[in-house]
Every structure is written in structure tokens, then in C-alpha cells.
């Protein structure tokens, strides 16, 4: 069961939408990280961070406060629900639409950013689609835009192509038909199964047997996210005692704080946020649409070890 997102509304109400960008962002960081450090369901919080990185949006690129706030709610409200539902929602997410410039798309001149990233980074992964699939999807969603007054989703029919489209050799006319075709794609489910494996098990690619098990389990559950997680945790390799994962700065600092019962957090978590950002991870401002790096990429050019060895965290333990 997903945790209510009313706690984030506290930060939204406290800073309103007319406050300066830094105050707004720090408010949201504070309430998100407070939940991360004190939640009774830390596994949900890890899932939420996983999906926040999967559907990656950089606030500083466009600084639309209400749209970004709605994006965070969207991520949390669906983190423990259905993967297909997530995908259906992300092509109508105002923050993602703006981040990938789909509001500038027209039927006669479609912007392909959202369509390309949807297939490459959100659903299928490289090698499982053709350029023509991108072009058709871009035309299909060319009217998916944003009302810049309310910063909510708005579909402009005059910008939408009325032609028939095709995906993976099959024709479709609307969202429903497209997602039915996507769901039937022989590789659908593999991409996200690999990401779960690398998030929870090890950084290496899963074996053919483990991948087949994960995908089959996922498909049989109608792509329910809790079942994907359950299947991942059932894997024998998950329980092997070996150093197979590398923590991000966020995982390291907040995991340590929870484990050691850290009691020195101020209301806005400034000390840990500063250390995390000095180590290369700025919450809500990932480097690009692919999100934060994982694994060994965190080991190079970091201040992480220096921050810990020099005692910059100034932690006070119970």
C-alpha cells in the first residue's frame, strides 16, 4: 500500500508557489528526506527513490514548481502499484513533458524527445524498437502538453496528428491500443527486470535463467511492481553474502543515519544534504534524463570518503 503524500504538501503550503526556487526546492527536499529517514516502511522509500531516478526530471532545468510537485506526488503514489499504469501516466506528466520539450511538439513537426526516452529509458531499452516506432509515437503524443497557467496536463487536439500510427509492425489509433501493443512486445518487462536486479542483487547482468524467471513472474502478475520486487527478493543470489552493490551518497548517508539511530538532523536535513551534494548527488537535480549513475561510477572523483574520514557529517549518535 502506497504511503500518502500529504507530508509533501506541507512543504508546498509552507513555501507556496511564489517563493524563490531555492526555498521551494529545499522545502521539498526536507520533507522527502524526513520520510526517508524516519518512515516505518523504508522499503517503500527505496522504491520511491528507484522510480524517482527511473522517471528522472531535473527541477533546475525549467523550475515549474507546481508541475514538479505533481511529478513527485505521481512518483510516490505509483511506486508500489502497476508498471503499465506508471508508463501510461508518465506521457501525461507535466514535468516530464516540459523537461523533454514535448510542449513544443506539433503534428507537422513532432519533437521526438519524449517518445525516444519513453522507449529507450522507461519501457523497452535499446535494441528493442526501430526509429520508425519513435517517429510514430512522437506524432501520436504531439498534442500532450501543459497548461502554463495551472501547470497541469492539457491535450491540444490541434497539435495532434489524426493519422494512423504503427508500433513494432502493428497499427494503433489511441493510447489504449498502443499500450496493448507495447504490453505484447516479446521483450516488454526485461528492461525493468534488469534494473531491479541491478538495484537489489548485483551490478552484473542477471543470468538468462534469473532474467527469464523475473520476467515470467512479472508478466503473470500483470506487471504489478510489488510482485517484481517479490520475485527479485526470491532469487538465490539476493541472499548470497558478497559485496555486489555500491551505495549512492543518498543511500550511504541516510542508510547510515537509520542504522546508527542518528538524532542530529535539523528540520531541513541541511547537514546531510550538504554532505550528500558535496559527494556528487543533488536530490531532484539529476545530471540528465538517464538519472543518477549507479555502481562503480560513484567511486570515481568523489568527496564521499573524504567527507566521512574528516568527520564533516558531525553526527551525534544516541
Language model features with spans:
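Flexible, low-complexity segments enriched for small/polar residues
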Residues: 1, 193-221, 229-318
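Cell-wall polysaccharide-cleaving catalytic domain and substrate-binding groove, primarily
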Residues: 1, 55, 92-98, 104-105, ...
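N-terminal accessory alpha/beta regions
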Residues: 1-78
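Long, well-ordered, tryptophan-enriched scaffold segments
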Residues: 3-8, 135-174
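Stable alpha-helical elements in mature extracytoplasmic
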Residues: 29, 43-47, 67, 71, ...
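An amphipathic, hydrophobic-aromatic interaction surface with interspersed Lys/Arg
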Residues: 38-41, 53-77, 81, 85, ...
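Activity-critical C-terminal alpha-helical subdomain
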Residues: 89, 93-136, 140-141, 149
Amino acid at each position: 500500500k502506497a504511503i500518502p503524500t500529504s507530508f509533501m504538501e506541507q512543504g508546498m503550503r509552507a513555501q507556496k508557489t511564489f517563493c524563490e526556487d531555492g526555498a521551494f526546492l529545499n522545502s521539498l527536499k526536507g520533507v522527502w528526506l524526513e520520510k526517508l529517514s524516519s518512515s516505518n516502511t523504508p522499503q517503500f522509500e527505496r522504491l520511491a527513490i528507484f522510480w524517482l531516478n527511473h522517471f528522472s526530471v531535473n527541477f533546475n532545468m525549467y523550475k515549474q514548481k507546481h508541475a514538479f510537485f505533481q511529478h513527485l506526488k505521481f512518483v510516490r503514489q505509483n511506486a508500489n502499484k502497476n508498471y503499465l499504469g506508471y508508463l501510461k501516466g508518465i506521457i501525461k506528466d507535466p514535468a516530464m513533458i516540459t523537461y523533454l520539450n514535448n510542449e513544443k511538439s506539433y503534428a507537422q513537426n513532432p519533437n521526438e524527445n519524449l517518445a525516444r526516452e519513453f522507449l529507450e529509458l522507461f519501457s523497452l531499452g535499446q535494441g528493442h524498437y526501430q526509429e520508425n516506432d519513435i517517429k510514430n509515437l512522437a506524432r501520436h503524443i504531439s498534442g500532450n502538453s501543459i497548461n502554463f497557467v495551472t501547470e497541469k496536463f492539457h491535450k491540444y487536439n490541434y497539435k495532434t496528428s489524426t493519422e494512423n500510427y504503427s508500433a513494432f509492425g502493428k497499427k494503433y489509433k489511441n493510447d489504449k491500443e498502443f499500450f496493448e501493443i507495447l504490453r505484447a512486445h516479446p521483450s516488454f518487462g526485461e528492461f525493468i527486470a534488469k534494473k531491479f536486479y541491478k538495484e537489489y542483487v548485483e551490478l552484473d547482468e542477471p543470468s538468462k535463467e534469473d532474467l527469464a524467471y523475473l520476467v515470467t513472474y512479472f508478466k503473470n502478475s500483470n506487471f504489478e511492481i510489488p510482485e517484481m520486487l517479490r520475485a527479485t527478493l526470491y532469487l538465490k543470489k539476493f541472499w548470497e553474502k558478497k559485496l555486489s552493490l555500491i551505495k549512492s551518497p543518498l543511500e550511504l548517508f541516510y542508510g547510515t543515519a537509520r542504522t546508527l539511530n542518528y538524532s542530529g538532523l535539523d528540520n531541513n536535513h541541511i547537514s546531510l544534504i550538504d554532505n550528500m551534494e558535496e559527494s556528487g548527488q543533488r536530490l531532484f537535480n539529476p545530471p540528465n534524463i538517464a538519472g543518477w549513475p549507479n555502481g562503480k561510477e560513484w567511486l570515481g572523483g568523489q568527496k564521499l570518503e573524504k567527507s566521512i574520514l574528516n568527520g564533516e557529517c558531525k553526527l551525534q549518535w544516541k
